[in-house]
UniProtKB/Swiss-Prot annotation:
This is YcgL domain-containing protein Swoo_2115. It comes from the Bacteria. InterPro entries: YcgL-like_sf, YcgL_dom. Residues 1-85 form the YcgL domain. HAMAP family: UPF0745.
Amino acid sequence: MICAVYKSRRKADSYLFVEKRNEFERVPEALLEMFGPPELVMMLPLMKRDHLGFADIEKVKSELADKGFYLQLPPPVVNLLEEHKREIGYSRD
């Protein structure tokens, strides 16, 4: 299975995987509107891979088969200062 990977020009680090290049028929219109004009990044052979960067490859394959697309969003931003305060038990009270 080879899929096309597009990046969003509106949402940083957001990627849309579709079954075939330039085929967005199965992608909801609202998602395409939010995503903005897709920019092709690469054609990706999934069968030759056992992992991807941030995405679970089995989930990507499953979503492509079931829905015709997979949306990869960036991980949430971690506030390292707040995390450190919590770890050391700091409280303003």
